[in-house]
Design a protein with these regions (language model features):
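Acidic/His- and Gly-rich active-site-bordering loop/insert found
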Residues: 1-102, 121-129
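Hydrophobic/aromatic beta-strand patches that form the interior of the parallel beta-sheet core
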Residues: 12, 42, 68-70, 134, ...
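Metal-dependent amide/peptide-bond hydrolase catalytic core
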Residues: 16, 169-179, 183-335, 339-342
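Solvent-exposed loop/turn segments at secondary-structure junctions
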Residues: 19, 64, 74-77, 139-141, ...
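Active-site nucleophile and cofactor-binding loops and adjacent substrate-binding regions
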Residues: 46-48, 103-107, 283-286
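Glycine-rich phosphate-binding loop signature in dinucleotide/nucleotide-binding domains
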Residues: 63, 156-163, 273, 296
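Short, conserved micro-motifs enriched in small and acidic residues
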Residues: 97-111, 140, 321-328
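Acidic/histidine-rich catalytic neighborhood of metal-dependent amide-processing enzymes
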Residues: 105-186
Length: 342
């Protein structure tokens, strides 16, 4: 844990905002740390409208070329009005068991954990598969000039990749005696100029929910939970537009086997740390760099489990932080999942 926190503090101190000057220095820092631990590193650049993008691929060969790829972006949202921050936005600090500063949660905290997992792999016995880390830039600008351009120029980066683990999931919420953790299996991109729709009735909603199971985006037990939630929520708010969005997504979405193929490894590792934890496979709104992998036909999950007390309010806002307990939990769970993936 000491290394993860040390690295994260240093990563936050690099100004990698949209027009920040430190992306290249940040990549060099990551490369040096990993190379010192025996990890193979390769640097790449792409051209962006605001600045050049800087990217890094790190690799620990395994017994097979088949690859699990960890992904994080090094660029951060801009800091906004620093008068709204309770601590320095652009300088890392530790307060009350938390690491604070822009990028702590999105996405330098996960990056520091991924660096530790690569270091562990380089110093331990070979895994059955190759483990790689891809650090990308310009995600906050939409990714087209970052990961999108990088993969267009270097499609070989995805050769032999059987799974990508990225951001967009791992957010906890309680339900009865269990703690559910979101497990991103897809993303619903914003639609421009949507045509008017006839609101879905109850029978339509059941059919639309079933589409998600049939295509593999979530499971039967999650479907049962959603139906119960719908019956309760429907008494207080109009949930019909939600189902219209879901129908749009599932009609066009490809069949996904990512939850069936890889969910059990993550669920088992999570329950080892939190016995009452369960995965909640979900399709999230918005767009992250995960979509570039999905568009290339590569399975990807969004999952970085956080401590239940860790607020998400600082993402793209003020007072961004990540708790040290979240860093510890994510490290243990993802390490355990990697041990279970064969």
């Amino acid at each position: 844990m000491d290394e993860i926190i040390e690295w994260l503090l240093r990563l936050i101190d690099f100004d990698t905002t949209s027009e920040g000057p430190d992306a290249e220095r940040c990549v060099r820092y990551i490369a040096r740390i990993l190379a010192e631990r025996g990890v193979l590193v390769h640097a790449y650049t792409t051209e962006g409208a605001l600045r050049r993008g800087h990217h890094l691929l790190a690799e620990v060969p395994g017994e097979r070329a088949e690859t699990v790829l960890l992904h994080a972006h090094l660029d951060t949202a801009d800091r906004g009005g620093e008068q709204d921050w309770l601590f320095p936005a652009g300088r890392a600090s530790r307060r009350r068991g938390c690491v604070c500063g822009r990028g702590a949660l999105d996405c330098k905290g996960p990056l520091a954990v991924w660096m530790k997992l690569l270091s562990d792999a380089a110093e331990g016995k070979p895994r059955p598969y190759t483990l790689k880390l891809l650090v990308t830039d310009l995600e906050e600008q939409g990714g087209a000039e970052g990961l999108g351009a990088l993969l267009a120029a270097h499609p070989e980066l995805l050769s032999d990749v059987k799974l990508v683990i990225g951001e967009g999931g791992g957010f906890p919420f309680p339900f009865r005696e269990d703690m559910y953790y979101t497990f991103q299996t897809g993303e619903r991109e914003p639609a421009a100029d949507r045509p008017a729709r006839t609101a879905a009735d109850a029978a339509d909603r059941d059919r639309i929910l079933a589409m998600g199971v049939e295509k593999g985006y979530y499971s039967e037990d999650i479907l049962a939970y959603a139906v119960r939630w719908d019956r309760l929520a429907g008494r207080r708010l109009d949930v019909r537009p939600l189902y219209e969005d879901m129908e749009d997504f599932f009609t066009a979405a490809p069949v996904s086997a990512v939850y069936a193929d890889h969910g059990p490894a993550f669920a088992s590792a999570l329950r080892e740390e939190i016995p009452n934890a369960r995965l909640m496979p979900c399709v999230t709104p918005g767009t992250s760099d995960n979509r570039w992998f999905r568009n290339a036909g590569v399975p990807v999950v969004g999952f970085f489990p956080l401590d239940a007390a860790n607020s998400l309010g600082g993402i793209h806002g003020s007072n961004e932080y990540i708790s040290e307990s979240s860093l510890r939990l994510a490290y243990r769970v993802i390490s355990g999942a990697l041990d279970r993936i064969t």
